[in-house]
Amino acid sequence: MATSRYEPVAEIGVGAYGTVYKARDPHSGHFVALKSVRVPNGGGGGGGLPISTVREVALLRRLEAFEHPNVVRLMDVCATSRTDREIKVTLVFEHVDQDLRTYLDKAPPPGLPAETIKDLMRQFLRGLDFLHANCIVHRDLKPENILVTSGGTVKLADFGLARIYSYQMALTPVVVTLWYRAPEVLLQSTYATPVDMWSVGCIFAEMFRRKPLFCGNSEADQLGKIFDLIGLPPEDDWPRDVSLPRGAFPPRGPRPVQSVVPEMEESGAQLLLEMLTFNPHKRISAFRALQHSYLHKDEGNPE
């Protein structure tokens, strides 16, 4: 289907995944978000799309059948132009007007009430548990790709795109923030779904602080800021397959969570530390986090 079906309304922003446009579907009157990406022309099956792109898009389309309320919907995929070397593909997503960054900035002082944060976290974790149950690692969770509708529904965006976009990102170097990255990613070790739970922890703290938790300017600086809070991890937890040794960091013990997030109650601080656990094998999962007492205390009407 051609993107000419959609009427462009405004440029939303430029990120690691290229320019995003807000557009209108004249048939339904609904707004959509258009994200274009260049992929190498693979020739052959799939109309020239590389088989990896075909697989990734097929997975995203398969998730659509579940219509999970906390995941942004992929409405359409269109090949819009092609040359011998590359094909431009446009992904058509449902449009949500604000991201979590905007939502947090709009909250009047002293910030979001604890009950609102718990509600956002429950939705966030439900969406992430759904992705992880379908073997999707987001890899780039941050407030800019967690969307919040005007009715307060949280929707995760930009998941499943990392491999689709690998070609374009190699062509267009973009500074990607390190602030939400798990230690195993910063150390360039192997990683899986626990990387997302580290990012969730950083974002959870930010909902209270209204500013990022760890603001490093390099991988080593980011790790140093992490260890300032959680302490230098034991040798047994340090990954074996990395070039940066544990000895590069001075020994230090953990600090109380309340020193950086004073507004957080004790059970919330416990949950945060389970998310910010250095060893990914010991880090809490989205499924287990949803069972945590912090998210069930003072819960409103059952859903």
Swiss-Prot record:
The modification N-acetylalanine is found at A2. It is found in: Cytoplasm; Nucleus; Nucleus membrane. SUPFAM superfamilies: Protein kinase-like (PK-like). The modification Phosphothreonine is found at T172. Changing T172A: Weak enzyme activity towards RB1, but no effect on binding of CCDN1 nor CCDN3. It catalyses: L-seryl-[protein] + ATP = O-phospho-L-seryl-[protein] + ADP + H(+); L-threonyl-[protein] + ATP = O-phospho-L-threonyl-[protein] + ADP + H(+). Residues 50-56 are annotated as: Required for binding D-type cyclins. The active site is at D140 (proton acceptor). Residues 6-295 form the Protein kinase domain. GO terms for molecular function: ATP binding; cyclin binding; cyclin-dependent protein serine/threonine kinase activity; cyclin-dependent protein serine/threonine kinase regulator activity; protein serine kinase activity. Transmembrane segments: none annotated. Phosphorylation at Thr-172 is required for enzymatic activity. Phosphorylated, in vitro, at this site by CCNH-CDK7, but, in vivo, appears to be phosphorylated by a proline-directed kinase. In the cyclin D-CDK4-CDKN1B complex, this phosphorylation and consequent CDK4 enzyme activity, is dependent on the tyrosine phosphorylation state of CDKN1B. Thus, in proliferating cells, CDK4 within the complex is phosphorylated on Thr-172 in the T-loop. In resting cells, phosphorylation on Thr-172 is prevented by the non-tyrosine-phosphorylated form of CDKN1B. SMART domains: S_TKc (SM00220). One of its GO terms (biological process) is regulation of gene expression. Gene3D superfamilies: Phosphorylase Kinase, domain 1, Transferase(Phosphotransferase) domain 1. The keyword Cell cycle applies. ATP binds at I12, G13, V14, G15, A16, Y17, G18, T19, V20, K35. Its EC number is 2.7.11.22. Changing N41S: In CMM3; sporadic. Belongs to the protein kinase superfamily. CMGC Ser/Thr protein kinase family. CDC2/CDKX subfamily. Component of the D-CDK4 complex, composed of CDK4 and some D-type G1 cyclin (CCND1, CCND2 or CCND3). Interacts directly in the complex with CCND1, CCND2 or CCND3. Interacts with SEI1 and ZNF655. Forms a ternary complex, cyclin D-CDK4-CDKN1B, involved in modulating CDK4 enzymatic activity. Interacts directly with CDKN1B (phosphorylated on 'Tyr-88' and 'Tyr-89'); the interaction allows assembly of the cyclin D-CDK4 complex, Thr-172 phosphorylation, nuclear translocation and enhances the cyclin D-CDK4 complex activity. Ser/Thr-kinase component of cyclin D-CDK4 (DC) complexes that phosphorylate and inhibit members of the retinoblastoma (RB) protein family including RB1 and regulate the cell-cycle during G(1)/S transition. Phosphorylation of RB1 allows dissociation of the transcription factor E2F from the RB/E2F complexes and the subsequent transcription of E2F target genes which are responsible for the progression through the G(1) phase. Hypophosphorylates RB1 in early G(1) phase. Cyclin D-CDK4 complexes are major integrators of various mitogenenic and antimitogenic signals. It is linked to Melanoma, cutaneous malignant 3: A malignant neoplasm of melanocytes, arising de novo or from a pre-existing benign nevus, which occurs most often in the skin but may also involve other sites. This is Cyclin-dependent kinase 4. It comes from Homo sapiens. The lineage of its organism: Eukaryota, Metazoa, Chordata, Craniata, Vertebrata. The gene is CDK4.
